[in-house]
């Protein structure tokens, strides 16, 4: 299986030579949110300009940016002497009146590319991504900093189509040695107004709607159950008070009856002695 850097390089190929290449969007493996409102991440032209033979001397790659138009595909980035243009973001109104140089970076030989096996290492991830990718529009302060020097890689405009071109420059001579084609139009994202965002739950799944309905009605049922429990407790308290009063009345009515029985018993007991005296008296008469 070929190394991953080779696959990335092949992703930029169109016909097989540097002149017939086009800059391509970075793979979603390395740039998930791409393009954004103001930036576009591109794959660097790795192993393209030096694919046939090693280059001698020091070389840099210039990245030019141009707003898409009817003539942008044939726009030139060099003068009649093969000297690369030095137009800036401000001079071209952000690429609307002509191409501007946004980024310049050293051409890394294929043999010196960092291994992608260490992409999982947090301390090395940024270095590896910088070696394989370039982000257009990444500098948000260069336009307003009066002390800024160098290329101003200013933010791009939202909802705008751009074209990009890589140019190989020999730093010893300062001349263009090779270049790619202009890329296909790449459109930056558009900011979605909040008023147009559809928050209606009708776009949710049926299961989500059922769960939302149940959770929404659950507090109501809990409140009804709580109120019912309070009402039942009050009814039970009233019933227990009525039974206590009834028992006390029965007890009070039962007391006189018991007393009456005692009186009758007492009376019967008191009648006992006279009977005994009569028996004694009759016995005396018999004697």
Curated annotation (Swiss-Prot):
Disulfide feature = none
Residues bearing carbohydrate: 74, 139, 170
Bilayer topology reads: Single-pass type I membrane protein
Where would you find the membrane-spanning parts of this chain?
A: 208-235
> What keywords sit in the KW lines?
Disease variant, Endoplasmic reticulum, Glycoprotein, Membrane, Signal, Transmembrane, Transmembrane helix
- Protein's UniProt keywords contain Endoplasmic reticulum: yes
- From the Swiss-Prot or TrEMBL record, give the protein name: Uroplakin-3a
Source species of the chain: Homo sapiens
């Amino acid at each position: 299986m070929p190394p991953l850097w080779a696959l990335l390089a092949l992703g930029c190929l169109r016909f097989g030579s540097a002149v017939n290449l086009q800059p391509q969007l970075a793979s979603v493996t390395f740039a998930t949110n791409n393009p954004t409102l103001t930036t576009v991440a591109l794959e660097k032209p790795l192993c393209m300009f030096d694919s046939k033979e090693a280059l001698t001397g020091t070389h840099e790659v210039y990245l030019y940016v141009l707003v898409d138009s009817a003539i942008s595909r044939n726009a030139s980035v060099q003068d009649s002497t093969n000297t690369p243009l030095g137009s800036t973001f401000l001079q071209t109104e952000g690429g609307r009146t002509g191409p501007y140089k946004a980024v310049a970076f050293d051409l890394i030989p294929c043999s010196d590319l960092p291994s992608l096996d260490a992409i999982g290492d947090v301390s090395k991830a940024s270095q590896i991504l910088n070696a394989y990718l370039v982000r257009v529009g990444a500098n948000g302060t260069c336009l307003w900093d009066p002390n800024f020097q160098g290329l101003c890689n200013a933010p791009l405009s939202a909802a705008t189509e751009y074209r990009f071109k890589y140019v190989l420059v020999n730093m010893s001579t300062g001349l263009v040695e090779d270049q790619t084609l202009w890329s296909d139009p790449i459109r930056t994202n558009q900011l979605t107004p909040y008023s147009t965002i559809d928050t209606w739950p009708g776009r949710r799944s049926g299961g989500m709607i059922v769960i939302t309905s149940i959770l929404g009605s659950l507090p109501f049922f809990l409140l009804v159950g709580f109120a019912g429990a309070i009402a039942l407790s009050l009814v039970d308290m009233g019933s227990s008070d009525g039974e206590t009063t009834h028992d006390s009345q029965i007890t009070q009515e039962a007391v006189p009856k018991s007393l009456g029985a005692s009186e009758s018993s007492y009376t019967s007991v008191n009648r006992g002695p006279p009977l005994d005296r009569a028996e004694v008296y009759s016995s005396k008469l018999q004697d």
